[in-house]
Amino acid sequence: MAARLWAAAVAPATLNPPLLTLSASSSPSSSRLRRSVLGRLRSRAPRPADFVCRRAKNAAYDDYKFPDPIPEFAAQETSKFKEHMMWRLEQKKDDYFGEHVEEIVDVCTEILGTFLEHDYCGPGTLLVHPFLDMKGEIKERGLPGAPQAARAAIAWAEKNIDKDWKAWTGEY
């Protein structure tokens, strides 16, 4: 029934007359119904440009403090990362990296180590920037396989860093 009313309100001339027999009456209730159906089909008024998420606006920013970076954790994680990257890139040495595996691993390790030591503050703070920096630095130095090395670094970091942080700090 509602579909017929909608169809009658939208394009009465294009429909077959037998479909309009129930909805073509001119009673006041059918016109009210048509208006309410059409009212629901219209899009909502646009939101103001300065729309702010109420939850974020009302939340106290003190609730979102992260701990300081832990240099010992950064050193341990960097050595694990270097070991893994050396193993991973050696597997693809012939395809992408050639004789530059150690140089590429050193670049990636230096960048990740700096990030972990100064910027990583626990789960939720692992950013994409160090991995973009890895790719850019490898390319700037003219070394091969920048995208592949950055991808391998991201895969390892996603799998290990947050988990190792939780084990290190005892937050399970």
Curated annotation (Swiss-Prot):
Keywords: Chloroplast, DNA-binding, Plastid, Transcription, Transcription regulation, Transit peptide. One of its GO terms (cellular component) is chloroplast nucleoid. The keyword Transmembrane does not apply. It is found in: Plastid, Chloroplast stroma, Chloroplast nucleoid. One of its GO terms (biological process) is regulation of gene expression. The keyword Transmembrane helix does not apply. GO terms for molecular function: DNA binding. Residues 1-54 form a transit peptide. PANTHER family: PROTEIN PLASTID REDOX INSENSITIVE 2, CHLOROPLASTIC, PROTEIN PLASTID REDOX INSENSITIVE 2, CHLOROPLASTIC-RELATED. Required for the activity of the plastid-encoded RNA polymerase (PEP) and full expression of genes transcribed by PEP. This is Protein PLASTID REDOX INSENSITIVE 2, chloroplastic. It comes from Oryza sativa subsp. japonica. The gene is PRIN2.
